[in-house]
C-alpha cells in the first residue's frame, strides 16, 4: 500500500511534532538510506511473520557526518526539539524491513527524508492535533485533499503523572493519495490502530499507577495556591514515550506494527480487471467450440459401439471410422473457424488496399460488408488464404463462412468466402449476379505499380488483380457508414496498423450494438414498419446500404443471445396479445 503511517505528539513546549513514521519503498533505497545494508553494519533481527525481515540500519557516524546529515535533513533543528519531541537517539538511522515476497522495503525514521513527503506528513500532523479532531478529542477522523493527500487520524491520550492534566496527547495517522482506497480501508485501519493504541495506553497506565503509588501528588496539589492561569507543573514537560511506557524496544515494536499494517492493508484490497459481458464474437466462438466437442464425442462414441459389436473385426472397423471421421481442420473450415497458414502474403487491410488500389478495394470491401459472396481465383493457395484472413476481420465472427480452396464452385448459402483454382468454372448466372464479386489473380506481364509502395514486400509484384462484379459499386455511392469510417482510418498514415485494427474492433462493436437493438425491436417486440424506420433514423442507419448491413450482421448474432431475448424479453403488447 502506498501510504505513510506516523505517530504524532502534541508537545507542551513546541506544539505538534512527528515522532515516528514508516513509509514504503518500492524502488531501491536512496543514497544514505541503504548504506546500512552492507555487511558488518546491519544488526539482523529474527525473521518476522509473512516473510518480512527486520534490521536496524546502524552505522558509525563521525561528528562531521552527523553535522552534515542534520544540516541536510528536512526535519526541525535540534534546538527546536526536546526529549518528548524525539523518538530515535541522535545518530540512529532508523529501521528497515525487507519483504521477500514482493521485494518491498518498509523504512522507519522520525521524519521522511524527502522534503515533499516531510511537508505532507508535517501538515497532517498539525491538523490531526489541532483543528481536525472528533468530539471528545479521542477517536478517528478523516480529512485531506488532492494536493496534500488524504489522512486517517486517530487521536488518543497517554497517562503521565508529570504532565498537565496527567495526560499527553498523541495521534496515529495514515496518509494516502488515493481517497477511495483509504475510505474502503477505514474499518481495517480503525481496528488495528485501536489495538496499537490500547497496547500503548496499557503500558503507560502501569507506569502511571506505579508513579502515583510511589509518589502521590494529591497532597502537593491540595497545598498549591489556586491560580486561574495554566502553568507547568513541577516536573519534566518533555518526557519521552519510552519513559512513559517503560519500554526500551518501543520504536522497534512500532516499526514492526506499522510495517505489518501497511503490508496487510495493501494485501486485503486488490484491484481486479472487470470485463464486461462477452462480445458476440466470443459467444459465437464458444458455441462453435462446443459444437466441435459434441461432434467429436459423437464420433468417439460411435467408434466404441462398433468395436463392441464386432470385436473380431475391430481393426477394420477402426480403419473405416477413421477414414470417415472428419479431421479437425475440416471441422474448423466448415464452421468458419479456419486457421491460416504461417506464411502471410497480405499483412493488413491497409496493405491489401495498397495492392489492389483504392477503387478495387472499396468495391471488394463493400461486398464483404453487405454479405455478398467473395470469390478468389488463384493458383497460389497461400495468397487466397491470407486474403481471406485479412478480409474476415471486417465482419463479426458469426457472419464468416469460409471454404478456403475448392475444386468446384459452392453456392453462396454455404460460404461467403470461396477460394477456387483458375480452371474451375463459375456459372454464368453467378458471374452476372450483383451479389457476387470475383477477384482473379493473374501472372503479371510487367511489374505491378501498386506493390512498389509496400515497404519491403515485393512478393505480390508478379501478380495482377482484377476485381469484377455483376453490379459494380458506383463511384458516387455513399456506401455504408462503417465502410467510410474504415477507409478514413486506412488512409490516415498517422495511425499505425495496430491502431487501425483497434479502430476496426470499435466500429464492429458499435454496429453490433445497433444490430442487437434492431433484432429486439423487430424480432422480439414485433414492432410495425413505421416504428422500425424511426428506430433506424435514431440509430443513424436509415440509408439503404446501412439497412442491408444490419440485416446481414443480424445473422451473426449468437444463439445464446437470441434465445435469451426470446425467453426473457417480452414487450407489454405481446404479453397482452398472448393473454
From Swiss-Prot:
Main localization, broad class: membrane
Site (Essential for GTPase activation (GAP) activity): 164
GO biological process, any: ERK1 and ERK2 cascade
Tissue specificity comment: Expressed in kidney.
InterPro entries from the UniProt entry: FLCN/SMCR8_DENN, FLCN_DENN_C_sf, Folliculin, Folliculin/SMCR8_longin, Folliculin_DENN
Region (Disordered): 32-82, 294-320
Gene3D superfamilies in the record: 3.40.50.12430, Folliculin (1.10.10.1730)
Means of activity regulation: GTPase-activating activity is inhibited in the folliculin complex (LFC), which stabilizes the GDP-bound state of RagA/RRAGA (or RagB/RRAGB), because Arg-164 is located far from the RagC/RRAGC or RagD/RRAGD nucleotide pocket. Disassembly of the LFC complex upon amino acid restimulation liberates the GTPase-activating activity.
Domain uDENN FLCN/SMCR8-type: start-end pairs: 86-242
This protein's UniProt keywords: Cell projection, Coiled coil, Cytoplasm, Cytoskeleton, GTPase activation, Lysosome, Membrane, Nucleus, Phosphoprotein, Tumor suppressor
PTM remark: Phosphorylation by ULK1 modulates the interaction with GABARAP and is required to regulate autophagy.
Domain spans labelled cDENN FLCN/SMCR8-type: 339-491
A GO term from the CC aspect: plasma membrane
Membrane-spanning parts: none
Coiled coil stretches, renumbered: 287-310
Compartments reported by the entry: Lysosome membrane; Cytoplasm, Cytosol; Cell projection, Cilium; Cytoplasm, Cytoskeleton, Microtubule organizing center, Centrosome
Signal sequence, start to end: none
Family statement: Belongs to the folliculin family.
Disease: Defects in Flcn may be involved in renal cell carcinoma.
Name of this chain's protein: Folliculin
Naturally occurring in which organism (per UniProt): Rattus norvegicus
Gene responsible for this protein: Flcn
Amino acid at each position: 500500500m502506498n501510504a505513510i503511517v506516523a505517530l504524532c505528539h502534541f508537545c507542551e513546549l513546541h506544539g505538534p511534532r512527528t515522532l515516528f513514521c514508516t513509509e514504503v519503498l518500492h524502488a531501491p533505497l536512496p543514497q544514505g538510506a541503504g548504506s546500512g545494508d552492507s555487511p558488518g553494519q546491519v544488526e539482523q533481527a529474527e525473521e518476522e511473520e509473512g516473510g518480512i525481515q527486520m534490521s536496524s540500519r546502524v552505522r558509525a557516524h563521525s561528528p562531521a557526518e552527523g553535522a552534515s546529515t542534520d544540516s541536510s535533513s528536512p526535519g526541525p533543528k535540534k534546538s527546536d526539539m526536546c526529549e518528548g519531541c524525539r523518538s530515535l537517539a541522535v545518530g540512529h538511522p532508523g529501521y528497515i524491513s525487507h519483504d521477500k515476497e514482493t521485494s518491498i522495503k518498509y523504512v522507519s525514521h522520525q521524519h521522511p527524508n524527502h522534503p515533499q513527503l516531510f511537508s505532507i506528513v508535517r501538515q497532517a500532523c498539525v491538523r490531526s492535533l489541532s483543528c481536525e479532531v472528533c468530539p471528545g478529542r479521542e477517536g478517528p477522523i478523516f480529512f485531506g485533499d488532492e494536493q496534500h493527500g488524504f489522512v486517517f487520524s486517530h487521536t488518543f491520550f497517554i497517562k503521565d503523572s508529570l504532565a498537565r492534566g496527567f495526560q499527553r496527547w498523541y495521534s496515529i495517522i495514515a496518509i494516502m493519495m488515493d481517497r477511495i482506497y483509504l475510505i474502503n480501508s477505514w474499518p481495517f485501519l480503525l481496528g488495528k490502530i485501536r489495538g496499537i493504541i490500547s497496547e500503548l495506553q496499557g503500558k503507560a497506565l502501569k507506569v502511571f499507577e506505579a508513579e502515583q503509588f510511589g509518589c502521590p501528588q494529591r497532597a502537593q496539589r491540595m497545598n498549591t495556591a489556586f491560580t486561574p492561569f495554566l502553568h507547568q507543573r513541577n516536573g519534566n514537560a518533555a518526557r519521552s514515550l519510552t519513559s512513559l511506557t517503560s519500554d526500551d524496544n518501543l520504536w522497534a515494536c512500532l516499526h514492526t506494527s506499522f510495517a505489518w499494517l501497511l503490508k496487510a492493508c495493501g494485501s486485503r484490497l486488490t484491484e481486479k480487471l472487470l470485463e464486461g459481458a462477452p462480445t458476440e464474437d466470443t459467444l459465437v466462438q464458444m458455441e462453435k467450440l462446443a459444437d466441435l466437442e459434441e461432434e467429436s464425442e459423437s464420433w468417439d462414441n460411435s467408434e466404441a459401439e462398433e468395436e463392441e459389436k464386432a470385436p473380431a473385426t475391430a481393426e477394420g472397423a477402426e480403419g473405416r471410422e477413421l477414414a470417415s471421421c472428419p479431421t479437425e481442420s475440416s471441422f474448423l473450415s466448415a464452421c468458419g473457424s479456419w486457421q491460416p497458414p504461417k506464411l502471410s502474403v497480405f499483412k493488413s487491410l491497409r496493405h491489401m488496399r495498397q495492392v489492389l488500389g483504392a477503387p478495387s478495394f472499396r468495391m471488394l470491401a463493400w461486398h464483404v460488408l453487405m454479405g455478398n459472396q467473395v470469390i478468389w481465383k488463384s493458383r497460389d493457395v497461400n495468397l487466397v488464404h491470407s486474403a481471406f484472413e485479412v478480409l474476415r476481420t471486417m465482419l463479426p465472427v458469426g457472419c464468416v463462412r469460409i471454404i478456403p480452396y475448392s475444386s468446384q464452385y459452392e453456392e453462396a448459402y454455404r460460404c461467403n468466402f470461396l477460394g477456387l483454382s483458375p480452371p474451375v468454372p463459375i456459372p454464368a448466372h453467378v458471374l452476372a449476379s450483383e451479389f457476387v464479386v470475383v477477384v482473379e489473380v493473374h501472372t503479371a506481364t510487367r511489374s505491378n505499380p501498386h506493390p512498389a509502395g509496400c515497404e519491403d514486400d515485393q512478393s505480390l509484384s508478379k501478380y495482377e488483380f482484377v476485381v469484377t462484379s455483376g453490379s459494380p459499386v458506383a463511384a458516387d455511392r455513399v456506401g455504408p457508414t462503417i465502410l467510410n469510417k474504415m477507409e478514413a482510418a486506412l488512409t490516415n498514415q498517422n495511425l499505425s496498423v495496430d491502431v487501425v485494427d483497434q479502430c476496426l474492433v470499435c466500429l464492429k462493436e458499435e454496429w453490433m450494438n445497433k444490430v442487437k437493438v434492431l433484432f429486439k425491436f423487430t424480432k422480439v417486440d414485433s414492432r410495425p414498419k413505421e416504428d422500425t424506420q424511426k428506430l433506424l433514423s435514431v440509430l443513424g442507419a436509415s440509408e439503404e446500404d446501412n439497412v442491408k448491413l444490419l440485416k446481414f450482421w443480424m445473422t451473426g448474432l449468437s444463439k445464446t443471445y437470441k434465445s435469451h431475448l426470446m425467453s426473457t424479453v417480452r414487450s407489454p403488447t405481446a404479453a397482452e396479445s398472448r393473454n
